Curated annotation (Swiss-Prot):
One function term, GO molecular function aspect: magnesium ion binding
InterPro entries in the record: Isoprenoid_synthase_dom_sf, Terpene_cyclase-like_1_C, Terpene_cyclase_plant_C1, Terpene_synth_N, Terpene_synth_N_sf, Terpene_synthase-like, Terpene_synthase_metal-bd, Terpenoid_cyclase/PrenylTrfase
Motif range (DDXXD motif): 613-617
A Pfam family annotated for this UniProt entry: Terpene_synth_C
Keyword Lyase: yes
Protein name, as recorded: Taxadiene synthase
Gene (name only): TDC1
Catalyses which reaction(s): (2E,6E,10E)-geranylgeranyl diphosphate = taxa-4(5),11(12)-diene + diphosphate
UniProt: Mg(2+) 2 binding residues: 613, 617
Broad EC category: lyase
UniProt lineage: Eukaryota, Viridiplantae, Streptophyta, Embryophyta, Tracheophyta
Length: 862
């Protein structure tokens, strides 16, 4: 709907002079900067025009007498002896001349495409090479393995895994610590370094390394109390390491007040564990090696995975082997040492986490379309190991974790796999809080991010998803407000997902944001920091940048074509309408090169619909609108002689476009589809006539009547049918109504458009006399309801509609081409983002301009 009504008010007596002088009733100044006032008796039409340069004259024209009276200092334009409105819209931010000057080397040079093709092959090879997971070494875990002893032939103890001890000996950093050199985290360095010093001291070797390591620990222990928050795992494990170091005679400042506090806190938690004779709390299992004093080593064996590990942790597994001699633990560790060349990672296997994370990473970067088969293979693998209990990092993980499960739920559902959100209930405590709230380390924060993202895909009445949203959203907002982590990449991701949740996230905008914040040297954190080479990958980033720029160059060519068409057709000279070619193009939310014809058709039709919207609301009389509608119904240009010339021109441009696009549709579909194409246009213009009749009669419809009419006049029907028929897939006649009007998904997306629009435009429309909005109709149906009540109700309706639309979209339907479904479904995105704060179509604001610049104008530096 246009945001400017035909009249500023229906009752001149009710408004009086206030309509002219009250700034509340002249709110159009900032959006349309014009107003009409009609009186019942004399049908007096008042045009008030305010130019951008300040107040100007207002001309009052009486249609009954033909006389005019200047009531302020401006002039009026009369067309065919009928006063017409000529709206002073916000200027077009992307003028024809601006678009035509765009240049890029990525369209003309084949070098970029050739390099992109090479990278696609390399990344496919990476997919094909996926095994149990590629992950960086962990000094902390390797030191645990190095501490293990065996009995030599002379009865003395010796290292059971000397290769692990050698690795520790050879991998100290220059500052005396152990860890990932490029990333410093105090807790990570202290765990790695303390355990490495212990391992060397146990075997009385590396005296120089021990001395340097002890000095590093002593210097940094004093900083520990300055950390914002210590993870629960650290609070259990680190005091235990200090006890071991003290027993070995390693010289450290054990009497520091904060160290004593940590030890006291640990003792209290150990008392709780001792009281739970048959169970170790789930949130403490990850710190198993810090619980040696209280573990029943017979009972703990029930937590052993099929691969012999405990929670896929080499450190925990080494601790159990040290205390039990279990052969399966030995085999697990021995195999890891062979695989990683004398060291071990912080967890293994990670085959499920790696596959899910790689798919998620590829799709975030906007390059998923190049790897459809590889993605399917990876997700088929994950789905084979999916469980109602959830999943862990690897297929043999005995205890599921929230991060992998939430990521799996989202990714699998996104790709049409049947997964229930009830799996999330396994990660809530008795108070309904998810396990992730136990601590605020990076990995736990990451799990809440994926919990939030999973809840984006909620279906109606999914309690688990609603609970996840209620937990995750405030958690993440608080994390942003308090800055509990210095992880820049993660925080940028949190900012994006909170600001632009899935129903508002335009694919190209998401890709641009992810590329701009991508870190190919990124680390994750469990007990210690770790890298996953398949994710911290420069090849993926390089391809994403090249692909974005190559696709952007195509989009620029399309925009040039479209702005040129708009100008040459004469539509750019129409002064009663908004000129929003770039914004309408952005609204398609479809970026793939193969859908070029779809985008072009959608944009041309959409631009004309904006014009028709403004024509109906601003320019045309009711009789003229009826004549125009009759021409549409009869598909006949000969009925236009009674309407103004500019309206005739608009009709002819539209009619010519319909013929051209229909010819293109015939080529793709192999048959004439005009009968299908005409129907939504007839419905569309019939609704305009109905709305005008209600307005002229001063009638406010019921909420139900309103939706039946206004959800159609929002215009998705006409602007989507021909584009989806140009997507290259055959759409049978009986399938058209399954994907288009009146399908459930189509109506739900239209409903979300209509009502989301209303929440940001109703006040300005009300001030200008356009009484029928969703808010007003709801208040009419519910006497006593306030505007706030109505908005809350509408937001609930929109939320429900989006959930139902998601259900319809993901529901299996083999006869409906997926590209067509996606095109319709993705149109929900633009209305959510365009009306996030204001009327993004009516007001050409900088935020929308910035979106378009990022996606279509500014290339990414390669």
């Amino acid at each position: 709907m246009a945001q400017l009504s035909f009249n500023a008010a229906l009752k001149m007596n009710a408004l009086g002079n206030k309509a002219i002088h009250d700034p509340t009733n002249c709110r159009a100044k900032s959006e349309r900067q014009m107003m009409w006032v009609c009186s019942r008796s004399g049908r007096t039409r008042v045009k008030m025009s305010r130019g951008s340069g300040g107040p100007g004259p207002v001309v009052m024209m009486s249609s009954s007498t033909g006389t005019s009276k200047v009531v302020s200092e401006t002039s009026s334009t009369i067309v065919d002896d009928i006063p017409r409105l000529s709206a002073n819209y916000h200027g077009d931010l992307w003028h024809h001349n601006v678009i035509q000057t765009l240049e890029t080397p990525f369209r003309e040079s084949s070098t970029y495409q050739e390099r992109a093709d090479e990278l696609v092959v390399k990344i496919k090879d990476m997919f094909n090479a996926l095994g149990d997971g590629d992950i960086s070494p962990s000094a902390y875990d390797t030191a645990w393995v190095a501490r293990l002893a065996t009995i030599s032939s002379d009865g003395s103890e010796k290292p059971r895994f000397p290769q692990a001890l050698n690795w520790v000996f050879n991998n100290q950093l220059q500052d005396g610590s152990w860890g990932i050199e490029s990333h410093f985290s105090l807790c990570d360095r202290l765990l790695n370094t303390t355990n490495s010093v212990i391992a060397l001291s146990v075997w009385k070797t590396g005296h120089s390394q021990v001395q340097q390591g002890a000095e590093f620990i002593a210097e940094n222990l004093r900083l520990l109390n300055e950390e914002d928050e210590l993870s629960p795992d650290f609070q259990i494990i680190f005091p235990a390491l200090l006890q071991k170091a003290k027993a070995l005679g390693i010289n450290l400042p054990y009497d520091l007040p904060f160290i004593k506090y940590l030890s006291t806190t640990r003792e209290a938690r150990l008392t709780d564990v001792s009281a739970a004779a048959d169970n170790i709390p789930a949130n403490m299992l990850n710190a198993l090696e810090g619980l040696e004093e209280v573990i029943d080593w017979n009972k703990i064996m029930r937590f052993q995975s099929k691969d012999g590990s405990f929670l896929s942790s080499p450190a925990s597994t080494a601790c159990v082997l040290m205390n039990t001699g279990d052969e399966k633990c030995f085999t697990f560790l021995n195999n890891l040492l062979d695989k990683f060349g004398g060291c071990v990672p912080c967890m293994y296997s990670i085959d499920l986490l790696e596959r899910l994370s790689l798919v998620d990473n590829i799709e975030h970067l906007g390059i998923g379309r190049h790897f459809k088969q590889e993605i399917k293979g990876a997700l088929d693998y994950v789905y084979r190991h999916w469980s109602e209990r959830g999943i862990g990092w690897g297929r043999d993980s005995l205890v599921p974790d929230l991060n992998t499960t939430a990521l799996g739920l989202r990714t699998l559902r996104m790709h049409g796999y049947n997964v229930s959100s009830d799996v999330l209930n396994n990660f809530k405590d008795e108070n309904g809080r998810f396990f992730s709230s136990a601590g605020q380390t990076h990995v736990e924060l990451r799990s809440v991010v994926n919990l939030f993202r999973a809840s984006d895909l909620a279906f109606p009445d999914e309690r688990a998803m609603d609970d996840a949203r209620k937990f995750a959203e405030p958690y993440l907002r608080e994390a942003l407000a308090t800055k509990i982590s210095t992880n820049t990449k993660l925080f940028k991701e949190i900012e994006y997902v909170v600001e632009y949740p899935w129903h508002m996230s335009i694919p190209r905008l998401e890709a641009r944001s992810y590329i701009d914040s991508y870190d190919d040297n990124y680390v994750w954190q469990r007990k210690t920091l770790y890298r996953m080479p398949s994710l911290s990958n420069s090849k993926c980033l390089e391809l994403a940048k090249l692909d974005f720029n190559i696709v952007q160059s195509l989009h620029q060519e399309e925009l040039k074509l479209l702005t040129r068409w708009w100008k040459e057709s004469g539509m750019a000279d129409i002064n009663f309408t908004r000129h929003r070619v770039a914004e309408v193009y952005f609204s398609s939310a479809t970026f793939e090169p193969e859908y070029s014809a779809t985008r072009i058709a959608f944009t041309k039709i959409g631009c004309l619909q904006v014009l028709f919207d403004d024509m109906a609301d601003i320019f045309a009389t009711l009789d003229e609108l009826k004549s125009f509608t009759e021409g549409v119904k009869r598909w006949d240009t000969s009925l236009l002689h009674e309407i103004p010339e500019c309206m005739q021109t608009c009709f002819k441009v539209w009619f010519k476009l319909m013929e051209e696009v229909n010819n293109d549709v015939v080529k793709v579909q192999g048959r004439d589809m005009l009968a299908h194409i005409r129907k939504p246009w007839e419905l569309y213009f019939n609704c305009y006539v109905q709305e005008r009749e209600w307005l002229e009669a001063g009638y406010i419809p019921t909420f139900e009547e309103y939706l039946k009419t206004y959800a159609i006049s929002v215009g998705l029907g006409p602007c989507t049918l021909q584009p989806i028929l140009l997507m290259g897939e055959l759409v049978k006649d009986d399938v058209v109504e399954k994907v288009h009007y009146p399908s459930n998904m189509f109506e739900l997306v239209s409903l979300s458009w209509r009502l989301t629009n209303d929440t940001k435009t109703y006040q300005a429309e009300k001030a200008r006399g356009q009484q029928a909005s969703g808010i007003a109709c709801y208040m009419k149906d519910n006497p006593g309801a306030t505007e706030e009540d109505a908005i809350k109700h509408i937001c609930r309706v929109v939320d429900r509609a989006l959930k139902e639309a998601s259900f319809e979209y993901f529901k299996p339907s083999n006869d409906i081409p997926m590209g067509c479904k996606s095109f319709i479904f993705n149109l929900r995105l633009c209305v959510q983002i365009f009306y996030k704060f204001i009327d993004g179509y009516g007001i050409a604001n900088e935020e929308i301009k910035d979106y378009i610049r990022k996606v279509y104008i500014d290339p990414i530096q390669v």
